[in-house]
């Protein structure tokens, strides 16, 4: 009886591990405003950050989402190390790097940028939204990202623009790179909303559609 029970438990454990290995994972890193103002904060121009709605959108597509509202004043590099450890743990259990995506919005997207540099995984996915400008590129010039990188920015946004310079200067292994320019007229506020205009491409990227 004990042997049968042990065999059953081992089978259940194997099924559980196999199930976890076949799931796709998204690390979602919200913007700085939410870190400072909290879930109920209302930006005077852009309104509320639709954090829960973004999480829900990824979950509805079958992703396991790993995310939290960070404490105000969180050290970005240390947080990137935390995300790296979590991603390493998933890979150690047998999850393919290509099934893991790190999505970062606004200036906090450079946490994702740092993770891309720390991981050195050419098959891991990264989505950088509204981050790149002369200042952020200069401040993070020593970070050499690898992986499949999707950059999304808004034409009317003065904070985040093209990340092409990052791709061109990186000595890391960038397997796939794509950039999308939106033109919503919402300036930096476009990334406060759970908009299909950026969520749609991000979801496709996280599913391995790099076209």
What are the residue ranges of the model-derived segments?
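Conserved alpha/beta-hydrolase
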Residues: 55-73
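Short, surface-exposed "cap/lid" segments of acyl-processing enzymes
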Residues: 22-57
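Boundary at the C-terminal end of the N-terminal hydrophobic targeting segment
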Residues: 18-20
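Gly/Ala-rich beta-loop-alpha elbow adjacent to hydrolase catalytic centers
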Residues: 103-112
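Alpha/beta-hydrolase active-site loop
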Residues: 50-52, 73-94
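The feature captures the conserved acid-bearing segment of alpha/beta-hydrolase catalytic domains
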Residues: 125-188
């Amino acid at each position: 009886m004990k042997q049968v029970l042990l065999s059953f438990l081992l089978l259940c454990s194997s099924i559980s591990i196999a199930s976890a290995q076949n799931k796709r994972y998204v690390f979602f890193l919200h913007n700085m405003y939410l870190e400072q103002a909290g879930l109920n904060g209302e930006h005077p121009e852009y309104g509320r950050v639709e954090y829960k709605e973004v999480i829900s959108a990824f979950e509805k597509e079958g992703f396991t989402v790993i995310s939290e509202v960070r404490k105000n004043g969180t050290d970005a590099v240390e947080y990137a190390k935390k995300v790296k450890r979590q991603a390493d743990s998933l890979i150690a259990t047998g999850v393919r790097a290509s099934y893991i995506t790190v999505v970062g919005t606004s200036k906090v997207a450079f946490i994702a940028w740092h993770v891309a540099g720390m991981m050195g995984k050419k098959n891991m996915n990264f989505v950088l939204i509204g981050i790149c400008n002369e200042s952020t590129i200069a401040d993070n010039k020593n970070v050499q990202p690898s992986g499949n990188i999707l950059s999304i920015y808004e034409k009317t946004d003065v904070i985040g623009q093209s990340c092409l310079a990052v791709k061109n200067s990186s000595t890391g292994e960038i397997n796939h790179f794509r950039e999308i320019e939106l033109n919503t007229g919402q300036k930096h506020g476009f990334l406060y909303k759970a908009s299909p205009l950026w969520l749609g491409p991000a979801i496709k990227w996280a599913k391995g559609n790099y076209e």
